Amino acid sequence: MFYDLKDKKPKNSGENWVAPNAAIIGDVTLQKNSSIWFNAVLRGDIENIYIGEGSNIQDGSVLHTDPGC
């Protein structure tokens, strides 16, 4: 699922695969041919998370950033 967080919205190329129970939150960019697997959480509430072309985030992964990273 994709979730906005205040003024931060996920950006999706539309040419990728996201598991139905994955959470893409806030300032997250997904490039084409990327995949986000089951129970993964990508939380872009502080800084951007950029998932490049052809990348995959495996089952149960949690991605979050600190300020300035």
Per-region residue spans from a language model:
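A detector for short, charged/polar N-terminal pre-domain segments
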Residues: Y3-K9
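Short, intrinsically disordered, charge-balanced linker/junction segments flanking boundaries
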Residues: T65-C69
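A structural motif detector for beta-strand N-caps
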Residues: P10, G14-V18, A22, V28, ...
